[in-house]
Amino acid sequence: MAAENEASQESALGAYSPVDYMSITSFPRLPEDEPAPAAPLRGRKDEDAFLGDPDTDPDSFLKSARLQRLPSSSSEMGSQDGSPLRETRKDPFSAAAAECSCRQDGLTVIVTACLTFATGVTVALVMQIYFGDPQIFQQGAVVTDASSCTALGMEVLSKQGSSVDAAVAAALCLGIVAPHSSGLGGGGVMLVHDIRRNESHLIDFRESAPGALREEALQRSWDTKPGLLVGVPGMVKGLHEAHQLYGRLPWSQVLAFAAAVAQDGFNVTHDLAHALAEQLPPNASDRFLDTFLPLGHPPLPGSLLRRPDLAEVLDILGTSGPAAFYNGGNLTLEMVAEAQHAGGVITEEDFSNYSALTEKPVCGVYRGHLVLSPPPPHTGPALISALNILEGFNLTSLVSREQALHWVAETLKIALALASRLGDPVYDSTITESMDDMLSKVEAANFRGHISDSQAAPAPLLPVYELDGAPTAAQVLVMGPDDFIVAMVSSLNRPFGSGLLTPSGILLNSQMLDFSWPNRTANHSAPSLENSVQPGKRPLSFLLPTVVRPAEGLCGTYLALGANGAARGLSGLTQVLLNVLTLNRNLSDSLARGRLHPDLQSNLLQVDSEFTEEEIEFLEARGHHVEKVDVLSWVHGSRRTNTFIIGVKDPRSPDAAGATIL
């Protein structure tokens, strides 16, 4: 009995012991959906207002923790076995009682000392949380299409730049290192998500049609007058807008990072070497050839190429901002003159009227996650529609991969047909209605009901309009220590855009090819009225930077994804999301697995080189006409599970790189 009483006394006191008290004042560990090392988020001075919120204030949490552990009444204390309280049986004024009273005073001193010690430890812990140095290095990841640009993004993060600072520098770097895919003379779209505030913004800097552009001119001369294909570039305005909203380092410093790459030179990537050897613009000027083929022949991968002309442009933009690009200065005049000399109609007024748009992304819930993607004129709604349709199928590890591929192929036929009906909503109000239908779970169920489990549809379920998006695009994905997620995709449309190079070294885009007009393609696809040519309008786009977050709360999986390949990129993103969110595969495996794409114009189901003969035979037995190609698209990704972050490139890309801060 004495041993039991002693144990009971230890148990009762243990509730107030210093070690246990320290444990209850620690912040709760977030649940993880995959193994990951703990890495608490670092507090920032500019987040003080956010930390003052009752749901996130450490002081409030500590107070609530104490209140939960303190006994609610004296009777509760008295109910503890081995309590020091006893019934008084002697005269309290007697000598014996006085001796007992002295013993009780001693116990009070011990308990008081323990509580005082615990309080001191708690205060020290709180001071360490607020004022101490971080005990664990912050994590982050950067993924781009070129290893040198990934390294540049990491350098910006290491110098206390924000996630957007890193993305801007990396995107400008890609305009130097991958000029066939992106550049100052192009445009794009950036999606930014703030994890702590659970806020998302999309910055749309898609090119717009010149005010004097007419459909008739494109019909007659688009293939002989490359200047007609040039839209008003949005790259500089868009990146500057993103920096104004989320930048931490000075604008000039961010641009100086990229200018150094142009000035010092870079190693020619495999993809650029291939583009210069196989995809040289037919109208390449002497200036173009002198810039990219300085030795008179395509450079080999790894050879050094310098762009001092672009370094000078970036220095000007760093000092003067976007005004030097858009407000009638030398850069503006050069771009206008170059396009007009090649038959274009773009003017200085078109440049001065251009603005980047800041808006909300479209979103849909899929398997407990919120999927965020760009709204029209981008095809984010079609991506979410594909996920909504697939959500109703029994896609588990128990279902054969071949059966799942059949469902995916039939679903993508519907999603791509829906995408062909989108365009710029500013010029057509019906596009908003179409978008709402694409985001509807009810509509998705209706479409799902038309998909056979055993047979490919002999004809498209919906009318299909012309689909011919930009085949090349550059990707930047950043998850920084500041708890921001950035996904960005930019493009010039065709390799090297229009092929027109200004004296300052700016390649001009060919984005007007993304509009639809009669007899635009060799197969004479029906033109889309929603995507017809109009002055100031932005064409249909398959640039789809995509962010995924938990549908409820802040704990769980976050993703940043991007893709190139136009419509094939939408197909690739759908399948990667399916692999990660439905089949619970890790990101590396999800990106590496074989992907398919239904080409609606040719009625061929294209599959990449990762497909086995057995899978192809299964699809053909279901009525699909299969065509095997080497690569359909590159899909890069970054994943965060609570505080564990990883950046992963598509293994199909020979030059891309993902880097992670450990």
UniProtKB/Swiss-Prot annotation:
This is Glutathione hydrolase 7. It is found in: Membrane. Residues 26-90 are annotated as: Disordered. InterPro entries: GGT_lsub_C (IPR043138), GGT_peptidase (IPR000101), GGT_ssub (IPR043137), Ntn_hydrolases_N (IPR029055). Heterodimer composed of the light and heavy chains. The active site is located in the light chain. Residues 72-83 have a biased composition (Low complexity). It catalyses: an N-terminal (5-L-glutamyl)-[peptide] + an alpha-amino acid = 5-L-glutamyl amino acid + an N-terminal L-alpha-aminoacyl-[peptide]; glutathione + H2O = L-cysteinylglycine + L-glutamate; an S-substituted glutathione + H2O = an S-substituted L-cysteinylglycine + L-glutamate. It is a single-pass type II membrane protein. Glycans are attached at residues 198, 267, 283, 330, 353, 394, 519, 523, 586.
